[in-house]
Amino acid sequence: MGKILLSILLIGITIAPALLMGADKFVNIYSARKEALILPLLKRFKKETGISYRLVTGKADGLLKRLEIEGSLSPADLFITVDAGRLQRAKQAGVLQPIDNPTLEQRIPTSLRDRENYWFGMSQRARTIIYNTKTVDATNLSTYEELASPKWKGKLCIRSSGSVYNQSLVASMIEVNGIEKTESWARGLVRNFARPPTGGDTDLLKATAAGQCDIALANTYYLGRMINSKISSERKAAQNLAVFWPNQGEGDRGVHVNVSGAGVTKYARNKKEALSLLEFLVRDKSQKWYAEVNNEYPVVEGASISKTLESFGTFKADSINLT
């Protein structure tokens, strides 16, 4: 009990109302996704399956720490978070278990799930080049590697090296190009900064639209949010921006993609229900919901995408395994 109380004190959490409701079948979820991006699907899941949910939301690192502290006393059955890097940390921390599930293995490509099935991607996002259409000719863009070229000196906006999104991109670069070349590339990016790394992806895109920089590395769904924003200034800023898909040449690896995903916890008491929820989240209807609501790409091939995503065009994605 002391461990559980300590873990609650360590992090700020939100518990959905369903936590207070008794049910014969239920699944306990620790989610680093915002409640608005998971709760509507949980309500559909309960309506269709009769399985209730107990949802705890919070910061990814805090929830992971909580799982570690709680150990075998943890009530969590499922851990949901964004970025493969965080999912790998959960695996390495020993709080997840491997899963043998034909439905998940069939619907989710091997590149978008853990090699040993400790976690599975639920939706994917592309971290790509977004540029100011008034200051950049797209024919001058080509690859991630080329962003380190001196011609982009003083023109690049990027998040800090502490961003897990950038860490995952760098890890993919190391896998392809090796450590030495990737270190040299990173130094080139630093030389090309238009300003010190500050803020999140939305801040980068606003700065690019305003002409403070010409190009940014960002996840596409942030641009999707701006395009569909209720704030007129954000919609106006988005009109100055466009997506460029790098590394599309013949034989090249394609665009770096990452996932939001989930894994069944090591001590899950409701494993069957947790697996039912995972299967529900990769159904076509659920995949379409993520695409329409948050402009994330489906992990299931052939699932529908939003009109906003369609406007970005098609691209070849990097097939490197995210683990």
Where are these regions (language model features)?
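Periplasmic solute-binding protein
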Residues: 84-95, 113-142, 170-171, 257-263
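Short beta-strand->loop
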Residues: 30-33, 96-105, 115-116, 119-120, 131-133, 139, 145, 232-256, ...
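Alpha-to-beta junction loops
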Residues: 51, 70-79, 95, 152-154, ...
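Ligand-binding pocket segment of bilobal, Venus flytrap-like solute-binding proteins
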Residues: 168, 172, 176-246
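Early extracytoplasmic/lumenal segment of secretory-pathway proteins
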Residues: 23-88
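Mature extracytoplasmic/periplasmic domains
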Residues: 260-319
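A structural signal for short loop-to-beta-strand junctions that line the ligand-binding cleft
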Residues: 74-79, 97-129, 145, 156-158
